[in-house]
Every structure is written in structure tokens, then in C-alpha cells.
A protein has these predicted regions:
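Substrate-binding/active-site clefts of carbohydrate-active enzymes
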Residues: 22-46, 50-51, 57-206, 222
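Active-site environment of divalent metal-dependent phosphoester hydrolases
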Residues: 219
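Hydrophobic h-region of N-terminal signal peptides that target proteins for export
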Residues: 10-19
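Sec-dependent signal peptide recognition
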Residues: 2-10
Length: 223
């Protein structure tokens, strides 16, 4: 417990930006960052769950890393591949649900790290097909912004699309490019449909009570 508290960042949950997004003006809670880079063993869901009673009364929120499964080995989750499969390097989906439920019984809310600016593919173009409830979800190449990876001279996504006969979105990136993964077109109806379902899944199925959005410089805040 002491090692974790020394290592993890303690953040007062009352910055001006948080107030602008709807935090009560009298909020006095404290948020704990429940991970650090490559803390796969130290902050596994099962370990955090055992420490939940120690947090009770001191922390109101715990910020967890992006918990969806990626397409590879150990990962912090910031190369997202699946929206609805949350068997990650930190534990299984069931272990995550159990952790969040234990937090709740100890008066602690879990904050999800939401990575929706970019998405990992299998190769250049292949996105996984997922089913949740009675609906099927899958990103398409037309959900990739027209100028994806434009900063990478000689191997832009657009040039590769021409070589492969692939159609991208006609819309350009609304913010900073994230190299090496496909930046998503947030004007796309398909992207919007998937993201909305994903956020509902995080709250209604997994039990998160709020979000921290990653790479917010990459897309328009109006979305």
C-alpha cells in the first residue's frame, strides 16, 4: 500500500476544467491515479481490489488505464483494438467488474480512460467485428480521416490507401495526428454510433462512473 501511494499520482479532483464540465463547486474529493507506466503486476485489478478498503475515506475516485483488450502482447491500453472485450494486461473482464464493484462498496468511483482519437488495426486496414447485446459494431476504412499519418513523409495512410485500392473518409483530422495508428473521423455516423455504445457499455455494464478522455487535442470537443 505504501509503495503504491508513493508511486502513484494523487490529483485533487477540482481543476477549473473539471468545474467547467459539471463538477459541483463544493466538491472536495480526491482522485487517485491507479496505475503507472508498465505497472502490470503492481496494479493488477485483483491487487487494487484488495487495497480498496485502505482507500476508503481517503479517495473518492480511482482513475484506471484504458481497460479494453489490444491486439498484441502486454500493453497499457493506449493502442485500443476492442471496444467491448476488456480482457487486458491488468486482468480479465470479470476481475475488472469485481474491482469496480468493490470500489463502489467502499465509496469509491472508478474513472475510465477513454481512447477514441485513434484505433489499432490488424495490418493497415482490418478492424475487429464485435457484437454487444443484439448489435454488431465494426469500424470501416471510411472511418479513417483523409490525412491520417500525414506527418510521416513517405508512408502516409492516404498513399497506402491508393496502393491498396482503399477508400478513406473525405473529412480531415480535426486536431493533432497520432502517428502509427488510424485516426478516426468523429464526424462519421458509424464512429459516433460505436463510441456512444462503447460509453454506455463502460457505465451500464462495467460500472464506471465517469471518463478521462485521452488525446483530446486530436478531435473537436463538440463531439
Amino acid at each position: 500500500m505504501k509503495k503504491l501511494l508513493k508511486t502513484l499520482l494523487l490529483t485533487l479532483a477540482m481543476p477549473l476544467a473539471a468545474q467547467a464540465q459539471g463538477w459541483p463547486t463544493s466538491y472536495e474529493g480526491v482522485m487517485l491515479q491507479g496505475f503507472y507506466w508498465d505497472s502490470f503486476k503492481e496494479t493488477r485489478w485483483t491487487k487494487l481490489q484488495k487495497q480498496a478498503p485502505d482507500y476508503n475515506g481517503y479517495f473518492s475516485l480511482v482513475w484506471l488505464p484504458q481497460s479494453g483488450k489490444t491486439n498484441g502482447g502486454q500493453s497499457m491500453g493506449y493502442d485500443p483494438y476492442y471496444f467491448f472485450n476488456h480482457n487486458s494486461s491488468f486482468g480479465t473482464t470479470d476481475e475488472l467488474r469485481s474491482l469496480i464493484n468493490t470500489f463502489r462498496t467502499n465509496n469509491i468511483g472508478a474513472i475510465a480512460d477513454v481512447v477514441i482519437n485513434h484505433h489499432q488495426t490488424n495490418g493497415w486496414w482490418s478492424f475487429p467485428r464485435e457484437t454487444y447485446g443484439s448489435e454488431t459494431y465494426q469500424l470501416q476504412t471510411t472511418d479513417i480521416v483523409a490525412n491520417d499519418d500525414s506527418q510521416n513523409t513517405g508512408y502516409t495512410t492516404a498513399a497506402q490507401a491508393v496502393r491498396d485500392g482503399i477508400t478513406l473518409s473525405s473529412n480531415y483530422d480535426e486536431g493533432d495526428d497520432f502517428s502509427a495508428m488510424r485516426d478516426l473521423d468523429h464526424k462519421s455516423a458509424n464512429v459516433q454510433r460505436i463510441v456512444k455504445a462503447y460509453l454506455k457499455f463502460l457505465v451500464n455494464d462495467l460500472g464506471y462512473i465517469g471518463f478521462r478522455y485521452d488525446m483530446v487535442k486530436g478531435f473537436n470537443g463538440s463531439h
